[in-house]
Every structure is written in C-alpha cells, then in structure tokens.
C-alpha cells in the first residue's frame, strides 16, 4: 500500500496545477467519470482525478483489503475489534437471508421485532392504540446522537409521505429544547418514545423524566403513553413502560447506523410500515450493489475514493455537502455524525498513531440558501473546499415545477462555476460593458475573478422517495466503511465522546456548590465560579 500512496501523491503533485476543465477535451470525460445505479447518477468528472489517479485509487482499495473486509462485515465477523463486536446494521434491511453471529442466525429475532413494530404502528395509526384523550396526534422522540439525527433527518426528508401523527424530536439536555417542543402539544394525545439502548443516557433520561412530569399533569397514567427503544428491560419496566411497547436492538448495531430498526420507530409511525419497508428495500438494493459491483463501477467505493483523493492526497481538510433538496436540510448534520464519529480517529486498528489524516470535516446546508451565506468562501476563498451536490430531477410539488427548475439550474450553475471560474479578462470585459475604464476597471476586475478549478461531484436522482433515501443513506454508510478500511481505522467505535461525559459528571456538584474546584485548571475553576448557581 505504501507504494500506491506514494504513487498517488507523486501523481497529484504532477497534475496539481492542471485545469480540470482541460480534462473535458476528452469528449467521453463526463460519461467515463460517472456511475449509475437505477435512477441515480453520480457524476465525479468535475474533479482532477484522471485515468491514472482512478486506477491507482482502485488499486489502493484492493491492496487495503476492502473486498475481504466487506465480506467479513456482511458475514457477521467482529470487525469492530476494540469492542469485540460484529457490525451488522445491514441485517436490519436484509432480513430475508440468514446472518450468523457467534454461530446463531439473528434474522428470526430481527423479523420478530420488525413485526412487533409494524403491529404497534398499525394500531397507533388506525386509532386502536390511543392516548388517554383520544387518538395519538403527536409523537415525541427523545434521544441523542444516533437515536435522533437519523430518524429526524429521515422524517423531514420523507415529509410528503408522512400521513400519520406529527413527529417531533428532542435531543439537547438544554431545557429549552423540550420546553419549546412540548408547550403546544396535548399530553393526552401524545406518545413519547424514549430511545436509549442502555436507558441511562443522561441527556435522554433527563428529558424523559421531564416529559413524564409534563404528561402527569394531564393524564392519570403517563407511562401508558410512553414507548421505549432499549435493551434494558429492567429499567424500562421501572420507568413504567409496558413490555409490549419496548423494542430492543443488538449491540452489533451502532447508534449512528441504527435507524433501519427500532430507532426508526418514529419514522415508521410518520410514514407507515409500507413506506418504511420501501426505505429498507432501498438500503438493501445499495447493499447488493456494494457487494457485487466491481470497484470501478461501485458507487460507495467511488465516493470513498474521491473523498480520499481530496482529503488524504490533495490535503483538502473539509467537504461541503450541499443538497439542492430542502427536505434533505438535515442530511449534512446526519453525515457529520456518520462520518466524523466513525472516521475521526487518530489511532490505527493496530494501536499506532496514524501517519496521515483521518476523515474530513463534513458540513453543509441546503441550496440555494448556502449560496447567500458561505459560497463566497467556496468560490473565492484561499482554501479549496470540495463540494458534494445532491439534486432530484423531480420535486413533489407539480404545481411548483418552475421553482424546482430554478433549484436545479442553480445547482448545476454552482457546479459549473466551481469548475470554470471567471478570468480577469472576462471580468474586464463585463465591467467594460458597464462603462468602467482605466484604473477603476482594473481595481474592480481583480475582485470579480473566480479562480475556478475547484472540485465538485453531483449525486442526482429521480425523486426523493423512501427507496431513494434508503439508497442514499446506505451509500454513505458504505462510503464510511471503505474509507475506514483504507485508512486502517475502526469506523465503529467512538471513544472520543467519553471523556467529556466523565468530566461533566464531576463538574455538576461543583456547579451546585456542593464541591470545590480543587484540581481543576484555572480557566475551568473561573468558569465554574461564574456559572455556579
């Protein structure tokens, strides 16, 4: 692998100043550097990756053992080595084939849980399960991290398919979040879902207790309108939640990969079991593609390799995710957790510090909003930010087709502008037509130059349906896997979240005035003194 890394770096240095636009002298450039799956098109031709770089990147994936580790993951091997666990979120969307963990086929239990979820959701949506004031009108999902970001993103994305109760999401321990969410709801017609595998997550359980007190003001048996997604049956029982409304999942399903199962309960309630199954089917389709397609035609592999080229080879530290699809507004935040919690590591699988950067900083906002905010830096800033556009050919509002046309034209224009830029000569010509001359023209022209030659990709799809969203989410999950394998890291633990939790527990009595700040650094002690109640 070392030789391939070196060859990639040498090639990048040789072509660093080449204009990406020049690559399009090849009339087949766009076709060659694009990949299709069903109605999805991934166009990565507006990057500086040429045939040589592509072939080296594919060789890198082969040398890293992506194919072998891929099969190990799907077969239930314990590839999460630091926690001694399998990584089988894929089984949640492929329940029709045996998957063995420690020699036991886990799919019968998955099918049973899925059937229980469907039965509960059908009862709730039909009015057979009611609140103490009538049919359930609102559902509040209380969770954090993977118990919140995925289902919240998906509920917004699939809003056109939401024909069930309204779904709300509470994650932050800041009391303002749950206060503002509950204040306009009726406790007697609200269901609260507490999503915590251990039923001990501080933020989640604090909010759950607050919700229970809120509900108790209006209903005689508040726990009767709670459901739980947890494996801690003793704790959910102590909370008062009947076992029929408790849905568990295994430790080989990581939080940020979990919305395919019980963590997706709120999503299933919102869109119904049939649409939820279509979401699962879309993910399963991407799984099959990932397992079967050769690397040169494999969407998750290619997304990963393009990302590695930009981050590890070119040194671009961030990637902007820019969905030109308002209902994907939460996708960048979801991908922040998926990618940065998975691949934001400093130690390789063997315990040694990495000799290269790990995953990139992922951020973004939906278009066209971002064009009037941070695109200035993307187009004319001194740092190059690779951009990842997502856009649908068709919207959900046929009476607003013209607005969708404007949206798509803006997406394509931004991608083209990043590629093409605007030269100083072109800027002079434009200003000259406006009547500027001499030194003022020259002064203004410099400010109107766009360097261009900034890489971007476009993921286009027919329409944002449940199946399409399933394909997109699974695509990014597998991208993370491929990048992690090539970087030699464990993408499925998250020890970086632990230290802050431990310190927060120690700080609570200090902030309450029950303990001193001995042993704390001067800054923390000062802040405790200022913020102490």
Swiss-Prot record:
Record field: transmembrane: none
Pfam families reported for this sequence: PGI (PF00342)
InterPro entries: G6P_Isomerase (IPR001672), G6P_Isomerase_C (IPR023096), Phosphoglucose_isomerase_CS (IPR018189), SIS_dom_sf (IPR046348), SIS_PGI_1 (IPR035476), SIS_PGI_2 (IPR035482)
Single Gene Ontology BP annotation: gluconeogenesis
Gene Ontology CC: one annotated term: cytosol
Annotated active site: 341 (proton donor), 372, 501
Cell location: Cytoplasm
Keyword Isomerase: yes
Enzyme Commission code: 5.3.1.9
Keywords associated with the record: Cytoplasm, Gluconeogenesis, Glycolysis, Isomerase
Pathway note: Carbohydrate biosynthesis; gluconeogenesis; Carbohydrate degradation; glycolysis; D-glyceraldehyde 3-phosphate and glycerone phosphate from D-glucose: step 2/4
Main location, first listed in the record: cytoplasm
MF annotations from Gene Ontology: carbohydrate derivative binding; glucose-6-phosphate isomerase activity; monosaccharide binding
Catalysed conversion reaction: alpha-D-glucose 6-phosphate = beta-D-fructose 6-phosphate
Function: Catalyzes the reversible isomerization of glucose-6-phosphate to fructose-6-phosphate.
PANTHER family referenced in this protein's UniProt entry, alphabetically: GLUCOSE-6-PHOSPHATE ISOMERASE (PTHR11469:SF1)
Family: Belongs to the GPI family.
Protein name: Glucose-6-phosphate isomerase
Lineage: Bacteria, Pseudomonadati, Pseudomonadota, Alphaproteobacteria, Rhodobacterales
Name of the gene encoding the protein in the UniProt record: pgi
């Amino acid at each position: 692998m070392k030789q391939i890394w070196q060859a990639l770096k040498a090639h990048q240095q040789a072509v660093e100043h080449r204009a990406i636009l020049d690559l399009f002298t090849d009339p087949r450039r766009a076709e060659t550097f694009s990949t299709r799956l069903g109605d999805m098109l991934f166009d990565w031709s507006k990057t500086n990756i040429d045939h040589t770089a592509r072939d080296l990147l594919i060789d890198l994936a082969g040398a890293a053992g992506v194919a072998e580790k891929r099969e190990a993951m799907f077969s239930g091997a314990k590839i999460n080595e630091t926690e001694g666990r399998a990584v089988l979120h894929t089984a949640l969307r492929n329940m029709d084939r045996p998957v063995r963990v420690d020699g036991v086929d886990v799919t019968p239990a998955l099918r049973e849980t899925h059937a229980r979820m469907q039965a509960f959701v059908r009862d709730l949506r039909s009015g057979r399960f009611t609140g103490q004031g009538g049919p359930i009108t609102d559902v509040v999902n209380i969770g954090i991290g993977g118990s919140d970001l995925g289902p919240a993103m998906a509920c917004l994305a699939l809003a056109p398919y939401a024909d069930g109760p309204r779904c709300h999401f509470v994650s932050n321990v800041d009391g303002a979040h749950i206060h503002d969410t509950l204040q306009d709801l009726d406790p007697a017609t609200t269901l609260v879902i507490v999503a915590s595998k251990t039923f001990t997550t501080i933020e989640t359980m604090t909010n759950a207790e607050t919700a229970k007190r809120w509900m108790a003001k209006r209903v005689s048996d508040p726990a009767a309108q709670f459901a739980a997604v947890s494996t801690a049956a003793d704790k959910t029982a102590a909370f008062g939640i009947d076992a029929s409304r408790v849905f568990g999942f295994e430790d080989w399903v990581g939080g940020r990969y979990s919305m395919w199962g019980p963590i997706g309960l709120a999503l299933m309630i919102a869109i119904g079991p049939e649409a939820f199954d279509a979401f699962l089917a879309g993910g399963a389709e991407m799984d099959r593609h990932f397992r079967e397609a050769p690397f040169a035609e494999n969407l998750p592999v290619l997304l990963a390799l393009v990302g590695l080229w930009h981050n590890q080879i070119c040194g671009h530290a961030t990637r902007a995710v820019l969905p030109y699809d308002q209902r994907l507004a939460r996708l960048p935040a979801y991908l922040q957790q998926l990618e940065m919690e998975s691949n934001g590591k400093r130690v390789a699988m063997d315990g040694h510090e990495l000799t290269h950067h790990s995953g990139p900083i992922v951020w973004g906002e939906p278009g066209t909003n971002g064009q009037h905010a941070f695109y200035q830096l993307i187009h004319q800033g001194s740092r190059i930010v690779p951009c990842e556009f997502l856009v649908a050919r068709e919207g959900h509002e046929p009476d607003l087709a013209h607005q969708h046309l404007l949206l798509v034209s803006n997406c394509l224009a931004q991608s083209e502008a990043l590629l093409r830029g605007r030269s100083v000569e072109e800027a002079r010509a434009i200003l000259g037509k406006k009547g500027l001359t001499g030194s003022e023209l020259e002064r203004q022209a410099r400010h109107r130059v766009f360097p261009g030659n900034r890489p971007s990709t476009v993921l286009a799809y027919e329409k944002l349906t449940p199946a399409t969203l399933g394909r997109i989410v699974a695509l990014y999950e597998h991208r993370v896997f491929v990048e992690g394998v090539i970087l030699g890291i464990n993408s499925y633990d998250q020890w970086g979240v632990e230290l802050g939790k431990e310190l927060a527990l120690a700080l609570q009595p200090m902030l309450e005035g029950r303990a001193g700040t001995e042993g704390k650094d001067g800054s923390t002690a000062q802040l405790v003194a200022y913020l102490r109640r």
